[in-house]
């Protein structure tokens, strides 16, 4: 389950993919399998996939316990060929983030 609280030390990777028309489902299926693969990495917390309503984007919101764990997850995915293969589904725009503010009702 995602943890969205400020100043926890948790690292959030937000990766926005642009996909060709009709390409969301294939990418979502692929990213779900990649998340299952990554989930056994120490420090991995969660992955959440989002589809845009206009059909042009998929967002992967993934969390790890620390910067070191984020690096391990990325290296494991790279070594397993997952990062190279995802290029067939769309263009990735990844970034690592820290939550700095939240507001809840």
For each of these PLM feature ranges, what is it?
Residues 6-8, 20, 40, 53:
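Surface-exposed coil/turn segments at beta-strand junctions on protein surfaces, enriched
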Residues 48, 93, 105:
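Solvent-exposed, flexible loop/coil residues
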Residues 56, 84-85, 101:
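Hydrophobic transmembrane signal anchors and adjacent membrane-proximal interface regions, especially
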Residues 98-105:
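Short, low-order "capping/linker" segments at domain edges
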